[in-house]
Amino acid sequence: MSEQTILFAFPGQGAQYPGIGQDLFEAYESVRHTYEEASDTLGYDIATLSFSDPDQAINLTRFTQPVLVTHHVACMRLFNELTGNRIQPGFAAGHSLGEYSALLAAGAIDFKQALSMVSARGELMGEYGQGEMEALTLEYADARALADEFYCGVAALNLTDQTVVGGLAEDLQALSEAMQQRFPRKRSTRLKTEGAFHTYYMVEAAKRFRAVLDANEFAEPAISVCSNYSGEFHDSTASSIRSRLFLQLFNPVLWVNNLNHVVDQGVNLIIEFGGGIGKGESAAEKRPNLEGIVKKTFRRHESPPEHMAVINRETLENTISRLA
């Protein structure tokens, strides 16, 4: 195939599901080693939590975040192993939590650091965060106007016409009712989260998380990594990376900006690692979390980037075959 400029991408919270990673765990020894390493770092059995979870603890933020990072890394490592490390990214990006996996992919942090940081991050977000989140099929300006009116905040710009807001449940309800009156053809969907992530309702969690960031060393990334906070690339200094990860907790995830920025830099292939969404229960029935956003973002682009994924055995085999 023609020369590719590649982005490694990692989804965020909401891409977890009971049984995540089990198909690859059972098939590949290297994946089992990744899960063992994660369990040793975290102090609990991440495989059991991921595969057999009758209490749905996987949906608690303090567990969701390490579960997803473990799956991100297991998928990426396996892909690298089976391709002989010949498919190298020029850039890395992650949505919210996924930004930590992107920094790992770039060599700025290692796996143990990523797990320790996101474990603390998830625990603090779950304990000190407030509120809920709502996805609106509105452009930023309209969503921001509604959020300002009802004591809410913009949490993410996923598409030009999909903006996520966060606030207290009663404020989101008032916002949703006002939206239905003013934009009757638009939709809103309540998201299942433990708080209004990426809004001012996360300030207390961020203040406490700063100590975790300050205690970690960050190496200069080997490739450019997108910052959700700025919408562009991280600076290479440790102090700047720490600061932007701190600010990311209570500011919007500028995901559509990240995607446009990397394509402006020449990215023509996006490979998504980990997670999965869809109503089916098994890993084989899941689809990539970010694929729809990528396709919608660039549907009118003259040269839209290709999207591939490694989230289960089928996508792993398909992606490797397409890149052969």
What are these regions (language model features)?
Residues 13-14, 42, 105-239, 247:
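Alpha/beta catalytic cores of group-transfer enzymes, especially the acyltransferase/condensing modules
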Residues 185-281, 285-292, 296-300, 314-319:
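Acyltransferase
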Residues 21, 25-26, 47, 59, ...:
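Generic, ordered loop/turn and secondary-structure boundary motif
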Residues 21-22, 36, 47, 148, ...:
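Bulky hydrophobic/aromatic packing residues
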Residues 70-77, 116, 170, 207, ...:
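Short, contiguous clusters of charged residues that form electrostatic/catalytic patches at enzyme active sites
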Residues 2-145, 272-322:
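FabD-like malonyl-/acyl-CoA
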